[in-house]
Amino acid sequence: MAEAIGAVSLVGHRPSIVRITVKNELKTQKSQSIVRFPVKVDYSAKGVLSHLMTQSVKKNRMSVFPIRALAMELTKEKKKDDRLPKTWNYLDSGADDKPSLWPPENKADKPSLHNPLLRQERMGCGWLGAIFEWEGVLIEDNPDLDNQSWLTLAQEEGKSPPPAFMLRRVEGMKNEQAISEVLCWSRDPVQVRRMAKRKEEIFKALHGGVYRLRDGSQEFVNVLMNNKIPMALVSTRPRETLENAVGSIGIRKFFSVIVASEDVYRGKPDPEMFIYAAQLLDFIPERCIVFGNSNQTIEAAHDGRMKCVAVASKHPIYELGAAELVVRRLDELSIIDLKKLADTDLTEFEPELEMEKEDERELPSSAVAVDDF
């Protein structure tokens, strides 16, 4: 009967259950349930035609319950799946026992607000935060000054000058992280902090304390402020240096959050700086857009579940293809572009990835022993 019910329900007509009373040989009344289909089949023509029955079916309490043919099929599949061996060596069939909800839960929603208008605003694509890097994004950057600082520090400390590939690797890292983990000049925390401080002093002497905004940066941050989009500034420079630089060019009022090297333990490509800035802005990572100029920034932003806009200031555009958007100047972007990046149909609705458990079984040895004759 289940197959017949499923076949008829596919036509689009819902069957109904009707209870009737019958008498058996002992003249005792017995109530039975039958299934009645509101279709009439005509076999007189060449093809089989179905017509809706005009007569109304008497409604009762049982007629309001639909026939769940699909549920019966799923029950059969569930029983078959239960018979499979449940061991770690068995590959999962792909069937998920947990019921899934649609639409998925929006991570931007915050029921504790108790304000439907604020909740609706948070779930819209206009609720987003901007996280800017400092050098090469907002101001002009000269990477040769950093390289010269490392070479000068190596000469003062009596170390061998780091090669070019190692200097490229330490870009975006904290000075302490680069000295102890990449350059391997010292593991003593006191010596590491001393050399990191000395490196910044050399950089400031070479730089001269003159900062110049990149073309289009001032206009873009003005647009974001007019649209009430909160902004954060992150850098691996010391806070004192960063505060003085931001104040000297008059853009301190645009940033509600500033994250410096003292606030985090590791620099790029670790996403710690960006995640901490998102927490201070009170935004979920999926609604934050990072503006950087290197592949280390793109990697860190994606590891933190954020979108990234790359500015081609020191790298060509084709090397920054991993970012969601690549521009030469910030004023090439519009609010519509940012809203599309913050759209809730992106990674916000995707399930978080879980690490697969490795198979720790010992494989049999493939060696073959041969007796010597």
Curated annotation (Swiss-Prot):
Signal peptide, first to last residue? none
Q: Which reaction does it catalyse?
A: 5-amino-6-(5-phospho-D-ribitylamino)uracil + H2O = 5-amino-6-(D-ribitylamino)uracil + phosphate
One example GO MF annotation: 5-amino-6-(5-phosphoribitylamino)uracil phosphatase activity
Q: Which InterPro entries match?
A: HAD-like_sf, HAD-SF_hydro_IA, HAD_2, HAD_sf, PGP-like_dom2
What is the uppermost EC class here? hydrolase
In what way does activity depend on pH?
Optimum pH is 6-8.
The answer to keyword Chloroplast applying to this record is: yes
Q: Name one Pfam family in it.
A: HAD_2
Enzyme nomenclature, EC number: 3.1.3.104
Subcellular location, in the record's words? Plastid, Chloroplast
Give the GO biological process terms: protein phosphorylation; riboflavin biosynthetic process
Q: How does activity depend on temperature?
A: Optimum temperature is 40-50 degrees Celsius.
List the GO terms this entry assigns under cellular component, sorted alphabetically: chloroplast
Transmembrane region positions? none
Instruction: Name the UniProt key words of this record, in alphabetical order.
Output: Chloroplast, Hydrolase, Plastid, Riboflavin biosynthesis, Transit peptide
Q: What does this protein do?
A: Catalyzes the dephosphorylation of 5-amino-6-(5-phospho-D-ribitylamino)uracil, also known as ARPP, but has no activity toward flavin mononucleotide (FMN).
Q: Which NCBIfam families match?
A: HAD-SF-IA-v3
Q: How does it assemble?
A: Homodimer.
Q: What protein does this entry describe?
A: 5-amino-6-(5-phospho-D-ribitylamino)uracil phosphatase, chloroplastic
Q: Which organism is it from?
A: Arabidopsis thaliana (Mouse-ear cress)
